[in-house]
Amino acid sequence: MPYVDRQNRICGFLDIEENENSGKFLRRYFILDTQANCLLWYMDNPQNLAIGAGAVGSLQLTYISKVSIATPKQKPKTPFCFVINALSQRYFLQANDQKDLKDWVEALNQASKITVPKAGNLPLTTEVLKSLATPLALEKKPQVAYKTEIIGGVVVHTPINQNGGDGQEVGEPGSHAILRRSQSYIPTTGCRGPTGPPLIKSGYCVKQGNVRKSWKRRFFALDDFTICYFKCEQDREPLRTIFLKDVLKTHECLVKSGDLLMRDNLFEIITSSRTFYVQADSPEDMHSWIKEIGAAVQALKCHPREMSFSRSISLTRPGSSSLSGGPNSILCRGRAPGEERKTLCKAPSLASSWQPWTPVPQAGEKLLPTEETAEDSLFTPRLGESSTSAVLPSSRIRHRSEPQHPKEKPFVFNLDDENIRTSDV
């Protein structure tokens, strides 16, 4: 239902059909400002929006000719609906209940009435104009960005120097703050680095603070293990991280009191140490957050080891020698442990540069020149043993890098034998 704020404006939530005859109503926050002679509607309460965020729609009160309850013929399937006739356009709005509908219709009709001021009210009008000029002068005061921290249980505001690193002069006007904030909402690929776990869901929501109970818009990101919220989408470091293992329950907040009464699409994340109150932009978004968080918590409880293994693969840097270092890791899973250990211990760079030990021949000793073929193995039989004979289990096989033992006869075969094979020479 509508209420009057500190600036004597009528405020509240309504559903508006922005495109006539579309049948789609969107939730908006309306402000009826009789002093500014206009009706404004925002995406949310301006206190929750970013600095400099303007209204998504406006309507001058002088253009309103009539405000009445919509007939069943106009909107048969929309209860508590009323219509604003302004110039040649009609605005259909939907209230929460019958009392809300009646209050809004009376307030809009009262504000759109054309009144002729009396002669005795001219000085009063001048005073009103002066009082209106005073807040406008105060609003022109430059706003300073600050960072809120809790040090020793005390809230400390630290001013932030926004000129640092931008190449701007100190004497430039302070309008760059709004420009920087508008640039910060340019969509990007995400707030996480390329090595982080993939995001399940992300988006902006309004969160209640723990100390001052203030509501601020934050960028939430949900992955397989945590719920993080950032000041904006481009931030790398989160303001806080909620581990899914600590989440006890996530559901829609139905029991409201105090400041929570005016909060729609509100759900709570209950942990062992704190309850987080989060407001989504729409009921669909709220139910989507509740569903995704609940599914992630359930998946973490059912398969904690598989989730941790998948995260270790995603966090491994490319080119590393771990199991997830390359495409060969999939082939190594089916090997024996000994073979896998050999593959990991022997680096490719060392294998290409490894050279066998070459002995220095003794004086007066001749080495038999041999031709290496593709069939030569790494280990060769000792001198004096035939290549065709079977190798005894107790005999030691000589490595090609081991020097040959000196023998009396330099040649094993008789070169004058006619039955000798050419391959034995």
Swiss-Prot record:
Molecular-function GO terms, alphabetical: fibronectin binding; laminin binding; PDZ domain binding; phosphatidylinositol-3,4-bisphosphate binding; phospholipid binding
Pfam families: PH
Residue(s) of cross-link: Glycyl lysine isopeptide (Lys-Gly) (interchain with G-Cter in SUMO2): K141
GO biological process entries: positive regulation of cell-matrix adhesion
SUPFAM superfamilies in the cross-refs: PH domain-like (SSF50729)
Keywords: Cell membrane, Cytoplasm, Isopeptide bond, Lipid-binding, Membrane, Nucleus, Phosphoprotein, Repeat, Ubl conjugation
Membrane topology term: Peripheral membrane protein
Gene: PLEKHA2
Subunit structure: Binds MPDZ and PTPN13.
Protein known as: Pleckstrin homology domain-containing family A member 2
Chain intervals with Basic and acidic residues compositional bias: 400-410
Gene Ontology CC, one term: cytoplasm
